[in-house]
Amino acid sequence: AYDAVFRHYGVLRVDDMDQMAACLIMFSQATLPKHGNLVCLHDSGGERQLLIDLDNDLSVPLTEISADTETKLSSLLDPGLPAVNPLDAWGAGGTNAPEVMASCFETLLLDQSAAMGAVVHDRGPSSEIYASYIPYLERGKNLSKKPVFLVSNRQGSGESRLAVELTHKGLPVIDGINQFLTGTKKMFEYRDFQKLYKNRSKLKSIKSLSIGKSFDKKIDERDTYD
């Protein structure tokens, strides 16, 4: 019974407090996802595969990038790195690596099938967030106007003032890939429910209008035999 009521009213459900906290942080930023799915930027092939494995259980839709996006990414990536989503864009490193990472994230977000994006990078000692991550987020959000998030596998012991500052600026920092994927799924569910609700309201309006017109119609004696 609860499931039916929750589906009808668009109630979002989570399994624990960590997932709830992640959802609250993600929903608190001003931009909600529109059409499309999730794109992710990584600096580790192993971590990229970890996200894919975890996503198999949660079934969060990942963006299938277009041929045009694939071509643009290939021109940015070091040899041997596949132009796919989720994307491991960290090759040999070097002084140009931050620019490559930022450009790759922009390219992913500008794909027509991308609704939101995540930079999945780990924190440093004492939960430090490296300042070099910030341009990836800022450039991606400013160019695409889509929600973006900085995601780490775990917070660790300690806290980062920068994490709070970025979150308040609309660039939320989320700890835990599972928590982030759950939050992403809930954002997509909320988006889809809003579309369904609008369609349902529109249908009710049409029905009300039709019923109203039928009552406004003058009935003469001949109509009573129809």
Give the positions of each predicted feature.
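N-terminal alpha/beta PP-like core and its mobile active-site loop of ThDP/TPP-dependent enzymes
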Residues: 1-8, 161
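Glycine-rich, charge-decorated loop segments at or immediately adjacent to ligand/cofactor-binding or catalytic sites
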Residues: 152-169
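N-terminal beta-alpha lobe that positions the nucleotide/phosphoryl donor
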Residues: 198-226
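Short glycine-cluster motifs
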Residues: 34-114, 119-123
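Charged helix-capping and loop-helix junction motifs
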Residues: 130-137
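Short, small-residue-enriched loops and turns at beta-alpha junctions
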Residues: 124-128, 155-157
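Proline-centered loop/turn at the N-terminus of a beta-strand
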Residues: 12, 145-149, 172
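A charged, well-structured terminal subsegment
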Residues: 6-32, 173-206
